[in-house]
Amino acid sequence: MFVECLPQYSSALDLISYAKWVAPGEGEGEILDFQIWPKRYNEYRNSGKPYVDFLYDHPALHGVDRQILLDCVPDGPPPGLPERYNLLAPHGISQGFHYPLAELMNKAEEQMGTYFLMHAPCHCYYSVPHWSASSVVEMAQAIKHADKFMTINSAPAVLASALRQNRLTYFLPQKEQWAQDNVAPWPGRVDVEL
């Protein structure tokens, strides 16, 4: 199986062995278009269905197991993190509902004690220990290996749904009209409120 996407998104395929990347327009054979933005965005919003339900309504996916399988994530902590740690993933790029960072940090300390704040690579300063992944694989590895994990509804939450089955994960969902975007619940996920 090949997945057609822009090069900047192709590193997500490093997490799996069963699909390979191909540049847009270079795919061959039957092509299934699951892209929602921008062409199907209004259809998605108007459906009222959760994101995953809307995606899996595609006829080619009927009866498919919805559990994400990430079979190429290394064991152990990634470079820069200790053997034991808790992790907060407070950032995302597609959230309609935004949580104040200071409140997320307070909630993380309340629920997990000491933690590392995961952020995008930058020359930035945080008042708590912080870490950034140099790749999508390192981000997934950090999420998988954390003792406790807290995340907003963003890419780290999707990774956690695959990598942290039955492991304590605090989840801060999208609210109000954006609740439709939330990742489907998984065993080990605990929804928290600020």
What does each model-found stretch correspond to?
Residues 1-194:
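Catalytic machinery of carbohydrate-active enzymes
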